[in-house]
Curated annotation (Swiss-Prot):
Location of the protein in the cell: Plastid, Chloroplast thylakoid membrane
Binding site for phylloquinone: 692
Function statement: PsaA and PsaB bind P700, the primary electron donor of photosystem I (PSI), as well as the electron acceptors A0, A1 and FX. PSI is a plastocyanin-ferredoxin oxidoreductase, converting photonic excitation into a charge separation, which transfers an electron from the donor P700 chlorophyll pair to the spectroscopically characterized acceptors A0, A1, FX, FA and FB in turn. Oxidized P700 is reduced on the lumenal side of the thylakoid membrane by plastocyanin.
Gene3D superfamilies: Photosystem I PsaA/PsaB (1.20.1130.10)
Catalytic activity as recorded in UniProt: reduced [plastocyanin] + hnu + oxidized [2Fe-2S]-[ferredoxin] = oxidized [plastocyanin] + reduced [2Fe-2S]-[ferredoxin]
Organism: Mesostigma viride (Green alga)
GO molecular function list: 4 iron, 4 sulfur cluster binding; chlorophyll binding; electron transfer activity; magnesium ion binding; oxidoreductase activity
One example of a Gene Ontology biological process annotation: photosynthesis
Name the record gives this protein: Photosystem I P700 chlorophyll a apoprotein A1
Binding site for chlorophyll a': 675
Cofactor remark from the record: P700 is a chlorophyll a/chlorophyll a' dimer, A0 is one or more chlorophyll a, A1 is one or both phylloquinones and FX is a shared 4Fe-4S iron-sulfur center.
Pfam families referenced in this protein's UniProt entry, alphabetically: PsaA_PsaB
UniProt keyword list: 4Fe-4S, Chlorophyll, Chloroplast, Chromophore, Electron transport, Iron, Iron-sulfur, Magnesium, Membrane, Metal-binding, Oxidoreductase, Photosynthesis, Photosystem I, Plastid, Thylakoid, Transmembrane, Transmembrane helix, Transport
Mode of membrane association: Multi-pass membrane protein
């Protein structure tokens, strides 16, 4: 940390431009108003594609970084407004169309539903019996469990929150307009990294966590304590009574009677009745102990509020981002991070690339924690919701990571300045990119042949009737010894590092089965040869995805094939006429290919999760022991490709294929329709532009014959447009097919 003399740095002030851009509905009503060429209107059908491609590409509207920054800032408010409207809609459905109050009274037998289908052409068949005398569509979003954890006990509270969401959305829309049209920040404000870090760390994350912890302590904890004890939700006092009435709280948590005295006398242990460190799961609800999660949020708040005082602003004390980055150099790293500060304050694509990669990774981490340490009451035994949340957070993470590579490549093409990056780490990485990519390529080939080869060996031995020669837990074992070591170490860890904890962080590591209402919430997950095999497929597909995306970024500006690639832009079909073999080399095309491998990769991950949980974790608990949904068949079947096809895909597709005539029939139709959407994508991916142009010209000729020729000339999609439409339908079709397959299966058997 450095303390600077007062004269060294000018104090930052918040400076805005007043009324910089006129509010004009007339201008907004004109399609393509942001571009001179688009504003002229359409001559050919390509116009509508360019309109969509460029509407949010603010770089193409202007070169003025200040105006681009303001547009991005304003758009963020619009994004938040849409999120608030969506959230409000969720809460409104909970209030108006759901069985939330019934579910709250008996969460182990009644299933969550917040959607009732109208009886038009027989669609009321979709309203299944979810228990408690309610007919509706079973939902798997986890909102009911979240609401219970928040301390919501009736529909009135959901209505109120829904209205609050709409008010928040209105405020966001207003802020977005106000900060672009009325008081727009100057560029310096957007580039003041230290202030931004302090405010986001201390304000957003620190005070955000603290206020949530406050809500949990004063509302969630007492409400959940009473619900767990079997008190009727209608008898539970209203939230403000817990907040106002200390005696009421002291009945549940005796330390409340002492007020703030223990805090100021440093006897913080007094508060251990509601700030706990138990570990494991609450045996009543199958969720994390809420007193543990409150403790976690208080701790997070303290950490981030401290972190939010770390950077030097107007007080001449603290860290400077630029100084930290420029001091970051070692004996083998040349100029180190010199020049990165300038990149991160002038290229929003560089910022976005980093943030997407990190947020995507975080989403994948969340997916894994949500099942291993279920944070909300009765979430763990709602298998459909558990499967949906895992799948959802994996897909979101995958898309964010690919988006990170996309914006990193856009940064390389549009914003990278070689003169400011001489011999720093970025320059050095780009200069030895051949070594990086060729080594990564070797790793991909090694992983691909070896992981796939193990399966091929097993399929061959299985077909020849030689089970004793297969890699399996009962023949030639390939145990994941390192993973088993990590599991065991985490299981034993509390004994060494947290002796007062009742259990380890997750039941996954070892210990007893946690059962709620006769269903397994979580239990130790045994890893064996089948897991070892599929984990190496995961390693292979992850590395190939990274290879494609990283090659796209590192070769975005130039390559041996096309030395002047930077001049062609982020997306281009080929390097002009007369240069064969230069198509599909743009940075955009690498993102396009990366999306397919991301899809491959995550499909195998969610299939592994779905089958492993049904085989080894989820099931019912009786006096005789645990009976799993698929009876532990993962270890025997998942070590051959045939086993995956026969005992997972085919065996578990029976529910969706046979769903017609039942409340799950919508999933059967979606399964069919999404397959169709997926197949439709192939028409775009395997086609040539000239073929369609010829066909279009025939059709236009016929229209001319009939004197009904269109004024806007029809054009075949460009190569890039066709690939974009293709990959969009490929992913949409694939994801919706998987969705229907998973939900029909797990709702039927779970």
């Amino acid at each position: 940390m450095t303390i600077s003399p007062p004269e060294r740095e000018a104090n930052g002030k918040i400076v805005v431009d007043r009324d910089p851009v006129k509010t004009s509905f007339e201008r907004w009503g004109k399609p393509g108003h942001f571009s001179r060429s688009l504003a002229k209107g359409p001559n050919t059908t390509t116009w509508i594609w360019n309109l969509h491609a460029d509407a949010h590409d603010f770089d193409s509207h202007t070169n003025d970084l200040e105006d681009i920054s303001r547009k991005v800032f304003s758009a963020h408010f619009g994004q938040l407004a849409v999120i608030f409207i969506w959230l409000s809609g969720m809460y409104f459905h909970g209030a108006r169309f759901s069985n939330y109050e019934a579910w709250l009274s008996d969460p182990t037998h009644i299933k969550p539903s917040a959607q009732v289908v109208w009886p038009i052409v027989g669609q009321e068949i979709l309203n299944g019996d979810v228990g408690g005398g309610f007919q509706g569509v079973q939902i798997t979003s986890g909102f009911f469990q979240l609401w219970r954890a928040s301390g919501i006990v009736n529909e009135q509270q959901l209505y109120t929150t829904a209205i609050g969401g709409l008010i928040a959305a209105g405020l966001m829309f207003f802020a977005g307009w106000f900060h672009y049209h009325k008081a727009a920040p100057k560029l310096e404000w957007f580039q003041n990294a230290e202030s931004m870090m302090n405010h986001h760390l201390a304000g957003l994350l620190g005070l955000g966590s603290l206020s949530w912890a406050g809500h949990q302590i004063h509302v969630s904890l007492p409400v959940n304590q009473l619900l767990d004890a079997g008190v009727d939700p209608k008898e539970i006092p209203l939230p403000h009574e817990f907040v106002m009435n200390r005696e009421l709280m002291a009945q549940l948590y005796p330390s409340f009677a002492k007020g703030l005295a223990p805090f100021f006398t440093l006897n913080w242990g007094e508060y251990s009745d509601f700030l706990t460190f138990r570990g494991g799961l609450n045996p009543v609800t199958g969720g994390l102990w809420l007193t543990d999660t409150v403790h976690h949020h208080v701790a997070i708040a303290v950490l981030f509020i401290v972190a939010g005082h770390m950077y030097r602003t107007n007080w001449g004390i603290g860290h400077s981002m630029k100084e930290i980055l420029e001091a970051h150099k070692g004996p083998f790293t040349g100029e180190g991070h010199k020049g990165l500060y300038e990149i991160l304050t002038t290229s929003w694509h560089a910022q976005l690339g980093l943030n997407l990669a990190l947020m995507g990774s975080l989403s994948i981490i969340v997916a894994h924690h949500m099942y291993a340490m279920p944070p909300y009451p009765y979430l763990a035994t709602d298998y459909g919701t558990q499967l949906s949340l895992f799948t959802h957070h994996m897909w979101i993470g995958g898309f964010c990571i690919v988006g990170g590579a996309a914006h990193a490549a856009i940064f390389m093409v549009r914003d990278y300045d070689p003169t400011n990056n001489y011999n720093n780490l970025l320059d050095r990485v780009i200069r030895h990119r051949d070594a990086i990519i060729s080594h990564l390529n070797w790793v991909c080939i090694f992983l691909g042949f070896h992981s796939f080869g193990l399966y091929i060996h097993n399929d061959t031995m299985s077909a020849l009737g030689r089970p004793q020669d297969m890699f399996s837990d009962t023949a030639i074992q390939l145990q994941p010894v390192f993973a088993q070591f990590v599991q065991n170490r985490n299981y034993l860890a509390p004994g060494f590092s947290a002796p007062n904890a009742l259990a380890s962080s997750s039941a996954v590591w070892g210990g007893d089965v946690v059962a709620v209402g006769g269903k397994v919430a979580m239990m130790p997950i045994q890893l064996g040869t089948s897991d070892f095999l599929v984990h190496h497929i995961h390693a292979f597909t992850i590395h190939v995805t990274v290879l494609i995306l990283l090659k796209g970024v590192l070769f975005a500006r130039s390559s041996r094939l096309i030395p002047d690639k930077a001049n062609l832009g982020f997306r281009f079909p080929c390097d002009g006429p007369g240069r064969g073999g230069t198509c599909q080399v743009s940075a955009w095309d690498h993102v396009f290919l990366g999306l397919f491998w991301m899809y491959n990769c995550l499909s195998i991950v969610i299939f592994h999760f779905s089958w492993k949980m049904q085989s080894d974790v989820w099931g019912s608990v009786t006096a005789q022991g645990v009976s799993h949904i698929t009876g532990g068949n993962f270890a025997q079947s998942a070590n051959t490709i045939n086993g995956w096809l026969r005992d997972f895909l085919w065996a578990q597709a029976s529910q969706v294929i046979q769903s017609y005539g039942s409340a799950l029939s919508a999933y059967g139709l979606m399964f069919l329709g999404a397959h169709f959407v997926w197949a439709f994508s192939l028409m775009f991916l395997f086609s040539g532009r000239g073929y369609w142009q010829e066909l279009i010209e025939s059709i236009v000729w016929a229209h001319n014959k009939l004197k009904v020729a269109p004024a806007i000339q029809p054009r075949a999609l460009s190569i890039t447009q066709g690939r974009a439409v293709g990959v969009a339908h490929y992913l949409l079709g694939g994801i919706a097919t998987t969705w229907a397959f998973f939900l029909a299966r797990i709702i039927a058997v779970g």
